[in-house]
């Protein structure tokens, strides 16, 4: 099996397991409905899994959410160890994913410049319907 393919499959499976574990986590401060693990990146030796978290909320809420998840990383690692056949379960490290925030800023800048990709797409679709 291609090592890159195996790594991608493991990352995907770990991401699914983390979402399951999140639903079982009992922390009243955590708003589970708004937390998404956008991607998982395994190190080459598969001992570390960097998990990028996207969360709708204020910057303070996002920072607090990442801190809560990092405090519970033992729970997540145990859950992965029980549900995934690996020699060693990877150590989990949570980071805030700033990709969504950056894409919103880019969209706002485009709108300020007079170009709105969403409206242009709608116009093109309407023109196709008229033809």
UniProtKB/Swiss-Prot annotation:
SUPFAM superfamilies, sorted: Ribosome-binding factor A, RbfA
Subcellular location: Cytoplasm
A GO BP entry: maturation of SSU-rRNA
Alphabetized UniProt keyword annotations: Cytoplasm, Ribosome biogenesis
Pfam families (alphabetical): RBFA
Keyword Cytoplasm in annotation: yes
InterPro entries: KH_dom-like_a/b, RbfA, RbfA_dom_sf, Ribosome-bd_factorA_CS
One annotated Gene Ontology cellular component of this protein: cytosol
Molecular function GO labels: ribosomal small subunit binding
Disulfide bonds: none
Quaternary structure and partners: Monomer. Binds 30S ribosomal subunits, but not 50S ribosomal subunits or 70S ribosomes.
Similarity field: Belongs to the RbfA family.
Function noted in UniProt: One of several proteins that assist in the late maturation steps of the functional core of the 30S ribosomal subunit. Associates with free 30S ribosomal subunits (but not with 30S subunits that are part of 70S ribosomes or polysomes). Required for efficient processing of 16S rRNA. May interact with the 5'-terminal helix region of 16S rRNA.
Name of the protein described by the UniProt record: Ribosome-binding factor A
Organism of provenance: Thermotoga sp. (strain RQ2)
Gene name in the database record: rbfA
